[in-house]
Amino acid sequence: MLNFTGQTRRRNVNLGNRTRNSKKDLLEKAKRERERRAQDKLKEDASKTIQKSIRRHFSNVRLFKNTFTSSQLVHMIPAYGGKLIYYISQYDLQQLLKLSHNFLSSYPNSLGNRQLLSLLKLYQDDALVAETLSDLNMDCPTVDEFLDSLSVYLCRASFLSYSSASKLADVIEAWEVMHSSASISIFSISIGSYEKRPFALQFYCILAERNLLPQLINTNPILWDNMAKTYSHCSKGGQKNIAKLLIPNFNNHIAPSVLRSDNDYVLKFYEKAFIDEVIATTANYVSDEDHVKNLMCYIASSPNQSCKNSVLITLLSNKDFVRRLSWEFFHTKFNASKTEAHPLFSVLAQLIDMHLLISTDRELLDYNSVIPIEELKKFTSTLKDFTFRQYWELPKSERNPMLKEAVPLLSKVYERDSRLHFLSTENNPTYWENSEKQFLNLRFYEELQEYEDLYREHLEEESDEDMEKEIDLDKERPPLKSLLLNKMKKRLKSSLRFRKLEILLELPFFIPFEERVDLFYMFIALDKKRLSLDDDHNLINMFTPWASTGMRKQSAIISRDNVLEDAFNAFNSIGERFKASLDVTFINEFGEEAGIDGGGITKEFLTTVSDEGFKDPKHELFRTNDRYELYPSVVYDATKLKYIWFLGKVVGKCLYEHVLIDVSFADFFLKKLLNYSNGFLSSFSDLGSYDSVLYNNLIKLLNMTTDEIKSLDLTFEIDEPESSAKVVDLIPNGSKTYVTKDNVLLYVTKVTDYKLNKRCFKPVSAFHGGLSVIIAPHWMEMFNSIELQMLISGERDNIDLDDLKSNTEYGGYKEEDQTIVDFWEVLNEFKFEEKLNFLKFVTSVPQAPLQGFKALDPKFGIRNAGTEKYRLPTASTCVNLLKLPDYRNKTILREKLLYAINSGARFDLS
């Protein structure tokens, strides 16, 4: 068809899109319709049921209100009990309870009480609690139902007033509910955060104050936790009652888990009031092992060291109690063969440990001290024998667990005795040494060699070439001794030789000091053999240098004006190669000094470096205490730490080469060097050798009364003028935390920790790091601090002139010459200090070598210096040589020798 434009237009016709339903669609539609009708039917039936129930409910309500008389209503509670809550209002129930009071309170059997308690079980607040309880027939106890209902109520309720809680307590008291074993149920409800549910805590406090507490508490940790919370919030009377309940029950598996928690309320158990209750409860039963075991568990469960210290300090303040414990221990057969801890031993050991910590030397030696010195001696003897027998006679798997406390305590007593000699007296200098012949005569060199090999294997991955790696001071240290001993034990099966090695490493004082010194130098000899530094290799290297397998000599040119700096630059970076022979050339203002090193120049170098590094104030590397003993400066930077590290290596080299140096270190510093495995930690008793004034002031503080401490207005902060902070908090928020009698020991501990541990850690670690490059830690740890000082600088108290005479070499003299005879007579007549000055004059050190004068290298020599009587004796300390003119006159010899040693006249190396 043509339109008016003359074109054909296509026409679109919509015929619809409806399709014919299939059979499947029809069936699906019918199914949906049936399901819809079924749902509608269910809704209709449910609606009818609800309407029927509502009509029945209102009918019952009308029935209760309008049908029954008062005489009939009183039977409602016995008949329906808790069901009434669903049918009548709270107000109507309250009226019903009042109406039924006389009837129910005299109900002839337990039904009335049971039904009343079924109401209590369903309450969610305390609106009707008082009325419900007042209706109970108190002459007809229903304890089980009461406990069940009360437990449910405490879990459901949102509120419980003081008066309602008091009425509940009245029922508990009247019915003697706490005699029932089920009574723990009402204390075993997790009250959660007591800030959110204070009513439950208030209820427990009321019960505690009236001493309505459960009899059995060892079965439920929630109960223990609730008692702890309650104790922290109730009155003194309530606390006293809870203390009586808990104190006999610390010896169970539940108490430690509660006491060691992070909750603040647990700390109340470690305040003086509770500790006094513990003492009062235990004091009359120290002969009863269970009571003492309970005390032991209480101490062991302390949530932190501060709490434990508080317990021990409070116990020590009760002299009578400590004396009873001590008397009981010494009058009871101590069975060391038992496999479990001995309670009396454990408690007494911890008390003695604390006594050693806080007592001055004078207090420790006092016969009237809380632990008299005689008691300490007796206990130490028992402890010493027990510990040795356990180590020597038993493999590790069979040893008593008490060794965990015994070994560190015995070591502390030994350290204190090393200075005070209250055990190792003049009459018994070998007190600590074990005299058993089999033990003394047993040789264990193979075990020592194996331990050394294992130690070196362990160090293989740790190179000391990289100084920055060496000075990684915060690196965690593994317990090396235990690790290596356990490896050895698997192969050696705990032989006697292995046990002696254990004793050497963990209880070295059982081995005579002289033997330990020999073992120390044997360790060095083994190490020199490992590095091919021994004499045999030196001889081979001299004639066949092309075949050398050992370390080569380390050469350096050292200016007399910059000894320490030149030595540091030459030798600090070479690591273990510093153990090799040193080829040192000194230069002074005139040029190179002449001399061939036969050991003398090396000694001169080491002693000169030591003198400058330790004693020259311009370097500010070390400080002195009030006894002029040295320790590393606590003001340092990275460069100073490296120099301190190097000086540690120098001291190690001196020990390695048997070179004594005239340096006295502070005792606390030496103890730190021997405490590597425990992170160099020091305790309060070490503070005296760091700052005696501070130490004595803190001792006075510990002995002050509550009012005296309060008057000082002390807080947990410390002035630190050398720090950028100026004032340092000892604990978080320390500037606002005041020191009291209860926390004074914590304050003392924190001051000690800051002064000795935090401030000294890096410089001590640096010095020890350098020292241990040359001297392995376990070589040093065979000794105590006093013995280590003797290794470094010799034995001051004993100068054996006969030994010196027998180890003297003469040049230009014979032993029978008049001048030599006069010399030894004059030396014998010298005062002790003059003898020390003579030794310093000829050897540079005013002490004798530990192994006697035979250990001097080179040996002491006397050379004829001519016949001019006006000349003074001179010395070359580098070769231990005295140049003595042939005076042939005893008086002149005495005058000249005294003048020389007091003026320090010496020759240099020319």
Curated annotation (Swiss-Prot):
<keyword id="KW-0539">Nucleus</keyword>
<dbReference type="GO" id="GO:0034450">
    <property type="term" value="F:ubiquitin-ubiquitin ligase activity"/>
</dbReference>
<comment type="pathway">
    <text>Protein modification; protein ubiquitination.</text>
</comment>
<dbReference type="GO" id="GO:0033554">
    <property type="term" value="P:cellular response to stress"/>
</dbReference>
<dbReference type="GO" id="GO:0071629">
    <property type="term" value="P:cytoplasm protein quality control by the ubiquitin-proteasome system"/>
</dbReference>
<dbReference type="GO" id="GO:0036503">
    <property type="term" value="P:ERAD pathway"/>
</dbReference>
<dbReference type="GO" id="GO:0006511">
    <property type="term" value="P:ubiquitin-dependent protein catabolic process"/>
</dbReference>
<feature type="domain" description="HECT">
    <location>
        <begin position="810"/>
        <end position="910"/>
    </location>
</feature>
<dbReference type="GO" id="GO:0010994">
    <property type="term" value="P:free ubiquitin chain polymerization"/>
</dbReference>
<dbReference type="GO" id="GO:0000502">
    <property type="term" value="C:proteasome complex"/>
</dbReference>
<dbReference type="InterPro" id="IPR000569">
    <property type="entry name" value="HECT_dom"/>
</dbReference>
<dbReference type="Pfam" id="PF00632">
    <property type="entry name" value="HECT"/>
</dbReference>
<dbReference type="GO" id="GO:0061630">
    <property type="term" value="F:ubiquitin protein ligase activity"/>
</dbReference>
<keyword id="KW-0007">Acetylation</keyword>
<comment type="similarity">
    <text>Belongs to the UBE3C family.</text>
</comment>
<dbReference type="InterPro" id="IPR035983">
    <property type="entry name" value="Hect_E3_ubiquitin_ligase"/>
</dbReference>
<dbReference type="GO" id="GO:0034605">
    <property type="term" value="P:cellular response to heat"/>
</dbReference>
<dbReference type="GO" id="GO:0000209">
    <property type="term" value="P:protein polyubiquitination"/>
</dbReference>
<feature type="modified residue" description="N-acetylmethionine">
    <location>
        <position position="1"/>
    </location>
</feature>
<keyword id="KW-0833">Ubl conjugation pathway</keyword>
<feature type="active site" description="Glycyl thioester intermediate">
    <location>
        <position position="878"/>
    </location>
</feature>
<dbReference type="GO" id="GO:0005634">
    <property type="term" value="C:nucleus"/>
</dbReference>
<protein>
    <recommendedName>
        <fullName>E3 ubiquitin-protein ligase HUL5</fullName>
        <ecNumber>2.3.2.26</ecNumber>
    </recommendedName>
</protein>
<comment type="function">
    <text>Non-essential E3 ubiquitin-protein ligase that specifically catalyzes 'Lys-29'- and 'Lys-48'-linked polyubiquitin chains. Accepts ubiquitin from an E2 ubiquitin-conjugating enzyme in the form of a thioester and then directly transfers the ubiquitin to targeted substrates. Associates with the proteasome and promotes elongation of ubiquitin chains on substrates bound to the proteasome. Elongation of ubiquitin chains on substrates bound to the proteasome promotes proteasomal processivity. Also promotes ubiquitin elongation of 26S proteasome subunit RPN10.</text>
</comment>
<keyword id="KW-0963">Cytoplasm</keyword>
<dbReference type="GO" id="GO:0005829">
    <property type="term" value="C:cytosol"/>
</dbReference>
<comment type="subunit">
    <text>Interacts with 19S proteasomes.</text>
</comment>
<feature type="region of interest" description="Disordered">
    <location>
        <begin position="1"/>
        <end position="25"/>
    </location>
</feature>
<dbReference type="GO" id="GO:0005737">
    <property type="term" value="C:cytoplasm"/>
</dbReference>
<keyword id="KW-0808">Transferase</keyword>
<dbReference type="InterPro" id="IPR044611">
    <property type="entry name" value="E3A/B/C-like"/>
</dbReference>
